Amino acid sequence: MTDEQHAENNPAQSDGPTSAGFVALIGAPNAGKSTLMNAMVGYKVSIVTPKVQTTRSRVRGIAMHGNTQIIFVDTPGIFTPKRRLDRAMVSAAWQGAEDGDVLLLLHDCARKKIDEDTLAIIETLKKSGARASLVLNKTDLTLPEHYLARTKELSELYDFEKIFMISAESGEGVDDVRDWLAEQMPQSPYLFDPEDLSDLPMRLMAAEIMREKLFLNLHQELPYQMTVECESWEEREDGSAEIKLVIFVAREGHRGIVLGKGGQTIKRIGQAARRELEEIFERRIHLISFVKHKKDWMDDKDRYRDWDLDFNA
């Protein structure tokens, strides 16, 4: 990210009191939480794919708005969990909601009707007594009469503190949300360095970008059956970096699919990941990828700890 881009998305600070706080983004899978956070921060800090349940752990993006620091917490989508990993992801989402100074419920208003996951989230909010604001996302994909009717329908289910209509993809309405959020943040010293954009370590970012490309290039349930780890990160004298990533698959048969004939599939995916990593880190990247079979990777306690997930959720 260039200095000019950083300045554009983080208005200049001035002398005086500072504010800082957390904004928790919750919603059904694929509501657009990661896209919104990236738009708010002005930088890609969370991976985005058309597939549901892409985000596995809580990711924090940091935006400066004058003398206010807004820390966005992108939580996994909330849905009915079936596996251990699902339960841990949903638990992390609700924990993120509890930790926020402001809670934003994102809803994909382009859907034909309110989805069951969103209805379940609203019922949980009612029981907890939590205050939440509604963000109807993807207004660019539907007609005004549709999302206005959806607004009325959702308002009858829950007394939202504030309602916004946006397109996180195009940026329409995003500034209004950011301005309002800045007003809600409590007076406080900054919680992160004002130059920081995320608390995500570079090694984890590299693994996440590779995982995003796997989701975009592999079909059906296969991407959900794999994970990516950064095995090593080596700085080179010429200023470039050598990154070794390991892709773990749950079934031996999946290994061949990921590799492709003559290794062409993983080569194509790796090239896409390398190009994006070079753009993010603004340096040359040497990316080396391995594909390994590890049947029980979903039951590895250490991996859950790395993702900031509760293994026993």
Language-model-detected regions and their locations in the chain:
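Conserved G1/Walker A P-loop phosphate-binding module
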Residues: 2-91, 95-97, 107
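Conserved glycine(s) of the Walker
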Residues: 32, 173, 265
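Conserved, well-folded catalytic cores of nucleic-acid-processing
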Residues: 43, 62-66, 96, 100-103, ...
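Catalytic P-loop NTPase motifs of RecA-like helicase/translocase cores
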Residues: 55, 79-80, 112-113, 142-143, ...
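Conserved C-terminal guanine-recognition region of P-loop GTPase G domains, centered on the G4
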Residues: 64, 69, 91-163, 234-237
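Active-site glycine-centered loops adjacent to acidic/histidine catalytic or metal-binding residues
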Residues: 74, 137, 167
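Canonical P-loop GTPase G-domain recognition
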Residues: 130-131, 140-198
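P-loop NTP-binding site
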Residues: 202-313
